[in-house]
From Swiss-Prot:
Family: Belongs to the class I-like SAM-binding methyltransferase superfamily. Cation-independent O-methyltransferase family.
Gene for this chain: tcmO
The UniProt record lists the keyword Methyltransferase: yes
Active site: residue positions: 246 (proton acceptor)
Protein name: Tetracenomycin polyketide synthesis 8-O-methyl transferase TcmO
Gene Ontology biological process: antibiotic biosynthetic process; methylation
Alphabetically ordered keywords of this record: Antibiotic biosynthesis, Methyltransferase, S-adenosyl-L-methionine, Transferase
CDD domains according to UniProt: AdoMet_MTases
Pathway: Antibiotic biosynthesis; tetracenomycin C biosynthesis
Ligand binding (S-adenosyl-L-methionine): 200, 226-228
Gene Ontology molecular function: any one: protein dimerization activity
Pfam families: Dimerisation, Methyltransf_2
Enzyme class, broadest EC rank: transferase
InterPro entries in alphabetical order: COMT-like, O_MeTrfase_dom, Plant_O-MeTrfase_dimerisation, SAM-dependent_MTases_sf, WH-like_DNA-bd_sf, WH_DNA-bd_sf
Length: 339
């Protein structure tokens, strides 16, 4: 997102106003399965349109727009291939696939963001109280779509977490709110000596078991069901808390951090990552907009600054607290429990 200092005139303002054009083009390309069709080999315009079901009228403009956006490459006049990034992350058969988030944007984010003005006037979330943002687990296919989108959001963080600590000092970790276990499985693969636990609501367990089977990690990551605030947390050397704190108000954040401190073994560590806002609150536009997303989708949630996170961890008794940038817009805070 362009910082305000780069908005110099009406052209920049209009470009910002029309920024959703590119987002919508990407979402349509994912819906048409375009990047999976192009995985492995380029296709000429006519064959690509036939296989993707694209009408000739808008085809060339659509595909060339994706070229201009860096998602496709064109050879000659009418042969298209995936860009390297699209081939890695938008082919649904690849492990780095993030297209699930594009589908979530289409079905959930676009409609709820249309109610931003109402949220700003009332201070109230704009999703149903029952079922929340994605509607709960009653519809398994909808739930899988949402969980796939969350895997996409968290996918890039796994590599950073694998190198964030000297993991030889630890024997176990809990991914708090770890959903279907995607990040926990990634971290266990990087450090097989670790005992891995995914802690989430009991309703998540069938999706967890299904995903672990697909990753062939059924015996490597265990599931523990419960509520963050009322059920006992598993004992572990490390707790991972990713994209969790931003969903709650200050009192609940502080209570959860205190519970984590209590559950950690002496000498253990907590890893907190979120789309934290820069301390000056001037340049992290995506994180600030993400905070508005929490306004739209939660009762009290918002994004927060690294300085706030350091203060909460320190107040709970963690020492040697530090922060560092990780994948994408995320910032990681690390704190240690004294021995």
């Amino acid at each position: 997102m362009t910082p305000h200092t780069h908005v110099r005139g009406p052209g920049d303002i209009l470009q910002l106003t029309m920024a959703f054009y590119g987002s919508r083009a990407l979402i349509s390309a994912v819906e048409l399965d375009l990047f999976t069709l192009l995985a492995g080999k380029p296709l000429p315009l006519g064959e690509l349109c036939e296989r993707a079901g694209i009408h000739p009228r808008g085809a060339r403009d659509f595909l060339d727009a994706l070229v201009a956006l860096g998602l496709l490459e064109r050879e000659g006049e009418d042969t298209y291939r995936n860009s390297p990034a699209a081939d890695r992350h938008l082919d649904r058969r690849k492990p780095g696939y993030v297209g699930g988030y594009a589908r979530l944007a289409d079905t959930k984010l676009f409609p709820v963001w249309a109610r931003l003005t109402e949220a700003l006037r009332t201070g109230e979330k704009q999703v149903p109280s029952q079922g929340g943002f994605f509607g709960g687990y009653a519809d398994p296919e909808a739930a899988r779509g949402f969980l796939g989108a969350m895997d996409a959001v968290n996918g890039g963080v796994g590599h950073s977490l694998a190198g964030a600590l000297d993991w030889t000092e630890y024997s176990s970790f809990v991914d708090l709110g770890g959903a279907r276990g995607n990040l926990a499985a990634h971290l266990h693969r990087a450090h097989p000596h670790l005992r891995a636990t995914c802690f989430d609501l009991p309703e998540m367990e069938p999706f967890f078991q299904e995903h672990m089977k697909s990753l062939e990690t059924t015996d490597q990551v265990r599931f523990a069901g419960g509520d963050f605030f009322t059920d006992p947390l598993p004992r572990a050397d490390v707790f991972i808390v990713g994209h969790i704190l931003h969903y709650f108000g200050l009192r609940q954040r502080e209570a959860l951090i205190a519970r984590i401190h209590q559950a950690l073994t002496p000498g253990g560590a907590v890893l907190v990552y979120d789309r934290m806002i820069d301390d000056d609150r001037r340049s992290a536009a995506l994180s600030l907009l993400g905070s508005l997303n929490m306004l739209l989708t939660s009762d009290e949630g918002r994004e927060y600054t690294p300085a706030e996170c350091v203060r909460w961890l320190s107040d709970a008794g963690f020492t040697d607290v530090r922060t560092t940038a990780v994948s994408g817009p995320d910032t990681l805070a690390i704190g240690r429990k004294p021995r």
